[in-house]
Amino acid sequence: MRKVQISVRRLVEFVLRSGSIDNRMTNSDRALEGTKIHQLLQKEAGEEYVAEVSLKLERIVDGIAFSLDGRADGIINDQMIDEIKTTETPMEEITEDFRPLHWAQLICYGFMLAEKSDLAEVTLQLTYYQVSDKEVKQFQRVMSREDMGAFVDDLLSKYVIWAKASAAWEMKRNKTIQELTFPYDNYRSGQRELAIAVYRTVASEESLFCEAPTGIGKTMSTLFPGVKAMGEGKTDKLFYFTAKTITRQVAEDALDEMRRKGLAARSVTITAKDKICFLDERKCEPDHCQFARGYYDRLNEALFDMLQTEEAITRPIVESYARKYTLCPFELSLDVALFCDVIVCDYNYLFDPVVYLKRFFAEGPGKYTFLVDEVHNLVDRARSMYSATLKKSLVMQVKRGLDSKKNKRLLNAINAMNKEMIALSKKLKDLEKTIYVQKDELGDWNASVLKFTFVAKEWLPQNAQSESQADVLELYFESLRYVAIAEFYDERYVTQVTRSHGDLEIKQLCLDPAFLLSEKLKLGSSSVLFSATMRPIDYYTNVLGGQEDTSRMIFSSPFKQKNMHLLVADYISTKYQMRENSMEAVVDALYALASGKKGNYLFFFPSFLYLQKVYDLFKEKYPNIRSQKQETAMDEEQREHFLENFQAGNEESLVGFCVLGGVFSEGVDLRGERLVGAAVVGVGLAQLNHESDLIKDYYNETIGRGFDYAYQIPGMNKVLQAVGRVIRGESDCGVVLLIEERFSADRYRALFPAHWNHAKTVKSTDDISREVTGFWQNR
């Protein structure tokens, strides 16, 4: 007999959902108050109230053995079950039949309690808490065990077709996984060891931090053992998280390679809502978008069609079915993900506290494996995801657009926010500062933002045709994020108030996201965090939520060391105060590198301003070398054109001037003769700035390594990534020139990977020319 496990919430929502997508009605309760209100009401209910009770039910329907689980908010006197729902809807609009899905969930819990405690009937209590007015309204029903059982069986019978299809698919999938062998004839150096480590991590339900240099084949080395473990029941789903679209494509290719070897596995790639939306102006409301209108009424038919036909559900496949059934492509990709074995998506679908995949993670941990690629990017991304900003300019924009006679309540809320901002602006003026920082929250300001979200939530659906709708909605979502982040605020945060260019900005700045990331990683049963550059690995383990006993592995580069000639020009200082004086020496060193062999080169600089100055001098002094430079805010077409010029058969040399840490310093794959050399000017330190200094101060106070954590290590990682553009394959050869005296200092040499231990110091342009010429003559 087939066994199917499903939560009450998922069962109810899947079977009974109907109607349209409407962003104005988005359920922000969790973002607004989290579990605080639940805990408050549970505490006030008295000693007879037992809070957060786990319930389970085994039920056989149409040959399927269902295992139903859920968590009731409370049980009173062993025979009344309570379900708490927070809402911003005015209390007078909340009737007994306000949300039928709420009763459906409660009936399921009631039957589970009746079965567990052998009760003939159960009192069902639905408790609504109106967040803005802090009022409570309760409804009660008494239902017999028999009636509740019939209701649950009816739900399960409607889900049976999906359960049987999923069970049949799982059996087919597991059979192909058992027969699946590694898709390539041979393992690359280090690849088998990495695959074994990943498999053991998944099987033992642990975490692994791993540096796997370019060439090992880390995508296949993580996905293949993950798939094998899934076939043995050691994990239910694989999530492949990454920061870049191109890396998601690599994951898709690896899955396709396994499919060519016989694997049957469903995968979906989730594309960002703004990118995949069919509309010129995204507005997720039924009155505006035909793909949102009636979405849930058409969804299940589309899902069934897709699941009968597709395995590799990539963006084009999602778009095709979305158009066929007139469905929002973004929501369709999320809904089909519930039936997929592998989900390929951006970091934020796990780590972001607002946009994370609630259908997987809102109810607590699951038997999931998290494969997190390019984790060197996750540090800054995590700080950004757990920080939040509001600007006075947006508040005033909304205020100016509202009719004071028609929108008094909303304007009162906005005026309260503006009043707090005026007070903060005055404080800055009195202090004669443009930036003010404090460790504690701004309590009155936060309260005004929270109040605005309540009022705006009520105003938006009632004023759908208002010219101010878009502005209010923007401020509403920004405020929701701000309030959501306020829930995490602790000693790892500061509040920063900045006055700049006539605007006032209030920011909750996350200095250390490690604890928050570790909590997110606990939502899975196993995790592997990896990158080509994770040096020193203890730093990444510390800042990305690892523990002292978390496993760590560092693999050697699979490429021959002799294929990359590494030169360190430590006779030049590019420190900020020395740049004007050393600029000509930098230009001469770059020319010495590029003139040693006809070919294509990339030169990396710490800022656009410095890049422009060196570029201008280089063009003036060496006009015979063809050159191009990265521009600010290049679109995708411009970036592609920039890279298309790097061809193996170019008749003359080409040098590209790029920004370190920018779009061309990682994720760029110019193999063979398309790139024969690179230079990195400087050690990658960000310009001194207030936020980095706050991070430095925090880590100085906590572990005594402020400069390392805020400046040196992040900067050196940019260097490592840029150098990684040169050797992309086993037969690639190239020269790398590091220009900066600090590259010879012990604190930087300690961050060199093992395959850089052959670095050679050069003391002049003549040395560079001689080394470059000699290297190429010996190839």
Stretches found by the model and what they are:
Residues 222, 249, 325-342, 347-451, ...:
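Signature of the SF2 helicase/ATPase Hel1-core->accessory helical subdomain module
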Residues 570-581, 631-743:
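Conserved RecA-like P-loop NTPase helicase motor core
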Residues 318-343, 354-361, 458-573, 581-582, ...:
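A contiguous, basic/glycine-rich beta-loop/short-helix subdomain that forms a polymer-engagement track
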Residues 203-225:
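Walker A/P-loop
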Residues 57-152:
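Mg2+/Mn2+-dependent nuclease catalytic core
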Residues 1-80, 100, 104:
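Metal-dependent nuclease catalytic cores that hydrolyze phosphodiester bonds in DNA/RNA
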Residues 168-211:
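Conserved pre-motif I regulatory segment
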Residues 174-175, 181, 234-343, 351, ...:
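A substrate-engagement module of RecA-like helicase motors
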